[in-house]
Amino acid sequence: AALAAFLVQLDPTVPQLADMKTAVSEAVTNCIVHAYPDKIGPITMTAAIYEGGIVRITITDRGVGIPDIAKAMEPMFTTGDAEERAGLGFAVMQSFMDKVKVSSTPGRGTRVTLTKRLDARA
């Protein structure tokens, strides 16, 4: 709800809102499941709107980090039980956003930056 309230100033379409909410939900879920496998830890989300309707949302954790980002971004790759996790988190984010950037340091955490241009309604 907070994301939708923030984005309302751009007058997004319902499908645009749904796409962004899905991508952000996936990013936050990944943090909860993977960053802190044995404990609870902080997750920070920031959002900014830039000229031209560019929206950038950054989700950051201070968890275990990702040792091989390229491998983690491969569809179907999972660090958990394949029966419990599909390994599609980053693929889902990429399908709904214009750009997904991931930076991570093992033992220090991960930052996922989601970028999407919201075209003005005609």
Predicted features, each with a name:
Residues 1-25:
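Conserved short strand/loop->alpha-helix "switch" segment adjacent to the catalytic nucleotide/phosphoryl-transfer site
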Residues 26-30:
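Conserved polar catalytic motif of the HATPase_c/GHKL fold
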Residues 31-122:
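Conserved beta-strand-loop-beta-strand hairpin that lines the nucleotide-binding pocket
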